[in-house]
Amino acid sequence: MNDYNVTGTTLGDAFAKLPPNWGQLTGALLFLAACTWIYLPAFDGVPAPFAGYRSPLEPAIVAKTRYAFAASDIISEGYAKWKSSMYKISRHGGDVVVLSRKYIDELQNAPHERLSSIKGLIKNFGGQYSGIDLLDESDIGTRALQTKITPNLTKFSDDMRDELEYALGRDMPDCEDWTLVPLQPILLKLLGRITSRVLIGLPICRDEKWLDAASQHAHNVTITQIVMKAVHPIFRPFLNLVLPTVWRYKSAVRRGKAILAPEVQRRRNLEDNDPDYVKPNDLLQAMMDLSTPGGKDSQPEDLAHRHLLITLVAGHSTAAAGSHALMDLVSRPQLLEELRDEVLQVLQENGGNWGKQSLSKLWKMDSFFRESQRQNPPSLLGFHRIVQDPAGITLHDGVHVPYGTHLCIAPHSVSSDPAVIPNPDVFDGLRYYEQRRQKPDESMKHQHATADKNHLHFGYGTWSCPGRFLASDELKMTLSALLLRYDFKYPDGSSRPTNKHIDEFPYVDPETPLLMRRRHQGGTGV
């Protein structure tokens, strides 16, 4: 058989013309490339020191592996040394430049074309291997939350309360006596149902096949991005083929599309043919209305996939926040009773009715959630941005940041700094309640869902978390119902577990149990 011919030269001829030692040269180059990856941190042109290295001669791969298990210490070390400037961190998921918050004003509202929040999220969440890169093609999900959902949260209060009642009746275990219950799976179900009621509405929000697809998608995407970030990019295409969590999240996407895509088409048919048709009030409809007619983001399967991604971000992060908060509260029985009394008082003042206005009166609970988030953030790093300007950007102090650089800020370090927050090591559940009482004209600044320079866990500026107001309302409504209906305590000899970390992400064992018992006094109220 003849060798394959390219432009008149056979492969055999081409190989014959190579230097006799080409194999050794190729091997040497590959060895050099491997050594460079193992020993040297990436060079990005930013004049900043690295945190996390034990010595100048330490291989980069060692520092990257250390970060996977000691991110909290490394980020804290960098902040302590360089909080007024910037520092770098070597990670398997890509090196980052951690900025001082003094730069935040000049960066917060930079246009997407120069500094991309979406690309920062995508890179930090597994990129193309988690499916989340779809968000870079259109921002209709973010715009739908910002313009259609958040301004109209009062209209969702009755639906949210109705779904919470349904969830409590369906998903809560029988706890007539003290019963050991895994906390996070329960909260995932309760909050997942409320979120789905707002995002997709009846009847699909109660379709167990949809709920399972959304849950499996979120769970497996999360694990996939952790695994992908832990290995060198050269191995990721192979892992993408063999990793079981990739198979599972892609299966969940297919199942989710099979449910939502026909729903999109059904709504469009009704809108075109039924003059009496009233559009549903949910996120899916908002995304449909904002999509580009005839564009990719208007296609039913594209809308379905985007919806799954928003459900992922909204559901799991809110449930994790709820788990941390309830564990913090059970550790402080006096504060628990104080919050329970506040709920009863607000309900009494509102004739037993529950709505957005009632939630806004829960100042103590709002403060408690903000304090719990301060000590148990969703991530130790935030405000992720990728420099998109081909010429790079130049900061106000003359530091030049080249194209492609991954920037971020360390919100937990900021809110743990005694120069920023008095007594930051003390958990003070009423910290922000007292600040609102003492300075009523600054009340908004200290609310749970407010993003400011001292509390950057929801981001800052134009690209702050668009679902934070919905999440805050869901958490307050759910905790209120649980406090009025159940007593909680830790098993004998147990206490609030300490947080663990994978990279910069804090977590507790999702199966952490609490003892629960149904209350038969005080009414339900919610």
Swiss-Prot record:
GO terms for molecular function: heme binding; iron ion binding; monooxygenase activity; oxidoreductase activity, acting on paired donors, with incorporation or reduction of molecular oxygen. GO terms for cellular component: membrane. Pathway: Secondary metabolite biosynthesis. Its EC number is 1.-.-.-. Signal peptide: none annotated. Heme binds at residue 465. It is found in: Membrane. Its cofactor is heme. Disruption phenotype: The disruption of the whole terpendoles biosynthesis cluster abolishes the terpendoles production. GO terms for biological process: secondary metabolic process. The chain crosses the membrane at residues 21-43. Its main location: membrane. It is an enzyme of class 1 (oxidoreductase). Keywords: Heme, Iron, Membrane, Metal-binding, Monooxygenase, Oxidoreductase, Transmembrane, Transmembrane helix. Cytochrome P450 monooxygeanse; part of the gene cluster that mediates the biosynthesis of terpendoles, indole-diterpene (IDT) mycotoxins including terpendole I, terpendole K, terpendole C, as well as the kinesin Eg5 inhibitor terpendole E. Terpendoles biosynthesis begins with the synthesis of geranylgeranyl diphosphate (GGPP) by a yet unidentified GGPP synthase. Belongs to the cytochrome P450 family. This is Cytochrome P450 monooxygeanse terK.
